[in-house]
Amino acid sequence: MRFLFPTRLINNSSLGLLRSPHTTAPIRSLWFRTKSPVFRSATTPIMTAVAFSSSLSIPPTSEEALPGKLWIKFNRECLFSIYSPFAVCLAAGNLKIDTFRQYIAQDVHFLKAFAHAYELAADCADDDDDKLAISDLRKSVMEELKMHDSFVQDWDLDINKEVSVNSATLRYTEFLLATASGKVEGCKAPGMLDTPFEKTKVAAYTLGAVTPCMRLYAFLGKEFGSLLDLSDVNHPYKKWIDNYSSDAFQASAKQTEDLLEKLSVSMTGEELDIIEKLYQQAMKLEVEFFHAQPLAQPTIVPLLKNHSKDDLVIFSDFDLTCTVVDSSAILAEIAIVTAPKDEQSRSGQQIHRMLSSDLKNTWNLLSKQYTEHYEECIESILNKKKADKFDYEGLCKALEQLSDFEKEANNRVIESGVLKGLNLEDIKRAGERLILQDGCINVFQKILKTENLNAELHVLSYCWCGDLIRAAFSAGGVDAVEVHANEFTFEESISTGEIERKVESPINKAQQFKSILQNRKNENNKKSFLSVYIGDSVGDLLCLLEADIGIVVSSSSSLRRVGSHFGVSFVPLFSGIVQKQKQHTEESSSSAWKGLSGTLYTVSSWAEIHSFALGWE
């Protein structure tokens, strides 16, 4: 059991830390402990920089400047764009040419709207340098239109044939031109803009609607370009990718952001809120544009849509995969806060408990022992000969050592008595207020609500108390999750300190995983099914590899070190999907995903999982 000692105690009079999403969480993974606490937030992402670092390379932006902050804040929309069927097929190079022709025709309407919007914005700017900068941006758009003319020639698009604007294109262009004309909620009507300063706001608002598109295309170009190799010299869309990954386009995107920052620097909080809303709306409309492109070909994404005829069995770890805090820290917090402070308050209690001060010291000792012994166990595993190729049997044997360690650690916890006297209602209340990783509960909710989808959700966890997990998911309206964890034993709703030990090691997890799948096979012996496992630690490694798709969320270094030692490959999910798409054809009969391949797919947010599995709402 990966357990953590709380680093900061809360007020003795309440379980305030457990009940408020705005307080400091006393948790750290034991083998990544730091002096500073983690802050619990309902919007805390798994990674604090733009949640792509283990999968997608984000172009650098200043996190201190407004454009950088907005890009980070609305990165979810960026993910839905890059994981769109259109974008995946384009990156893979097997997008049907007719689809690309239609896209180019629609994009021309976008660019013409950009050029007009820049023209209007330049008229509103009251600074000569700003006017010149906007004029330069307009020139870049005109150059891009010329590039589209070359695309027209390369792909035999009839430029004399009038191409109707689709609804997604129309929504964005109308939004952009309305913004550039000053028709913005919270802004004076165009005819009532009395001063040059007021007109300058319109220029800033226009940049707020343009910037996300520029940054998104710069990001897509860089990401697609990074996937090209020498063997892709004949990639049909290399010219498009080269354009948007070029230094010139990256500089143009940066110039747009810099100008937005300059124009907004003197704005009030309310005016900055308007820019944020415009930025978000532009990102949303871009997502809709990508998903509106008509595709008449099989695609890898979204996963669940393509496997709607199959049974789906989806597994997830809990601690630090679904949660921001480790459940052991929560249980330790409850134990310490509710423990008697002196002999007088201890008298008459149903179950004899340690004093709070003794309990704190005991938790400190258990934490120290766990940290030291865990590191020793991992190093012992890594001291064995490194595998030349994927060695599942060798990994299983090595993890038996870690399993023995985890069981012994649980023995020490039980024998110490630190889990005695916890009230079941306090545990459930803590679970209801437990902050989950941003986007986690949305994925589970969406899966359960999707019609014509035969899916099961299972949580496999080392957590000492399954009631805590069930309460956390129930609070999010996800009652259909099957929880496989350890359980406290209770006497009249008070914990005895004993644990019903069901899942306490990597081997136990793998056994539970296989048992669930075997039962599914026995029930539906003629029907195929797809298994997905989502985890973050060494304890999840066997299940991740056994699953048809193993997704690693913001993994610990121990997971990567141990996995790599036994020949496991860690591939960014988007890169893996593009490779799968290259092999995905009309004739593809079997699933592209198979367990025990030795490959795991890395993501750094649940939003990325959502984009891949479920697609755009």
Swiss-Prot record:
The keyword Cytoplasm applies. Pfam families: TENA_THI-4 (PF03070). In the N-terminal section; belongs to the TenA family. In the C-terminal section; belongs to the HAD-like hydrolase superfamily. One of its GO terms (biological process) is thiamine biosynthetic process. The thiamine monophosphate phosphatase activity resides in the HAD domain (297-571), while the TenA domain (85-292) has thiamine salvage hydrolase activity. It is an enzyme of class 3 (hydrolase). Substrate binds at D107, Y217, Y244. CDD domains: TenA_C_AtTH2-like. Knockdown mutants show reductions in root length and shoot growth. The active site is at C213 (nucleophile), E286 (proton donor). This is Bifunctional TH2 protein, mitochondrial. Its EC number is 3.1.3.100, 3.5.99.2. One of its GO terms (cellular component) is mitochondrion. The lineage of its organism: Eukaryota, Viridiplantae, Streptophyta, Embryophyta, Tracheophyta. Residues 1-28 form a transit peptide. The keyword Transit peptide applies. Changing M47L: No effect on the mitochondrial localization. It catalyses: thiamine phosphate + H2O = thiamine + phosphate; 4-amino-5-aminomethyl-2-methylpyrimidine + H2O = 4-amino-5-hydroxymethyl-2-methylpyrimidine + NH4(+). Keywords: Cytoplasm, Hydrolase, Mitochondrion, Multifunctional enzyme, Transit peptide. May be involved in the salvage of thiamine breakdown products. This protein has a haloacid dehalogenase family domain fused to its TenA domain. Phosphatase with the highest activity against thiamine monophosphate (ThMP) and, with a lower activity, against thiamine diphosphate (ThDP), flavin mononucleotide, inorganic pyrophosphate, CTP and dATP. Has a thiamine salvage hydrolase activity, but only against 4-amino-5-aminomethyl-2-methylpyrimidine (amino-HMP) and not against N-formylamino-HMP, desthiothiamine, thiamine, ThMP, and ThDP. GO terms for molecular function: thiaminase activity; thiamine phosphate phosphatase activity. Disulfide bonds: none annotated. It comes from Arabidopsis thaliana.
